[in-house]
Amino acid sequence: MEPKIRLAYLVTHPIQYQAPLLRRIASEPGIDLTVFFCSDFSLRSYLDPDFGKPIAWDIPLTGGYRHEILPALGRRDRVSFWRPFSYGLARRLNRANFDVLWVHGYNRWFHWRAMAGAKIRGLKVLVRDEATNISAPRNRLKQSFKRWFFLGLRQCVDGFLAIGT
């Protein structure tokens, strides 16, 4: 019997449309999944800044898979480049002897810190994000910066995961 792949997934917070995917992955016999959330604000009613309305999910967002909410400093109710200021992932990666770190996104400080820590520990790193390279026209300076940014990202990542089919 093949050993299970020990997969750690780092994501900002429980996301409604990801819950079925995470339950499905957790049901795979060859995968041992643990999800690490940087915040739990979406488990309660919260004001969505993009919609300007309160959101409260009526489905379980964390049922059916192993998960942990990382400790954080300061406010955890919003997501930005610096927030939530979560910590403790490195210790958890070491303790559980993971094989792979899957990171949802690449545009927050904890994404980069997690990827660097995983590479130092010899883990494979996978990235899945909801971004596209099709966007508004950019000036040459911004285009150049993005080109270098993604070259650097590729050095830290072993594979990119697509969203959709």
Kindly give the residue locations of the regions a language model identified.
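N-terminal subdomain of nucleotide-sugar transferases
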Residues: 1-71, 94-96
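Active-site proximal beta-strand in glycosyltransferases
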Residues: 8, 35, 100-102, 115-133, ...
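Short, flexible loop segments at the rims of nucleotide/cofactor-binding pockets, characterized by
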Residues: 11-13, 75-82, 135-141
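Alpha-helical structural signal in soluble globular domains
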Residues: 24-28, 117-121, 156
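Conserved beta-strand edge residues that scaffold enzyme active sites
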Residues: 40, 107, 132-133
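An amphipathic, basic-hydrophobic alpha-helix
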Residues: 63-103, 108-120, 144-152
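Nucleotide-sugar donor phosphate/pyrophosphate-binding loop at the beta->alpha transition
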Residues: 124-126, 132-156, 161-163
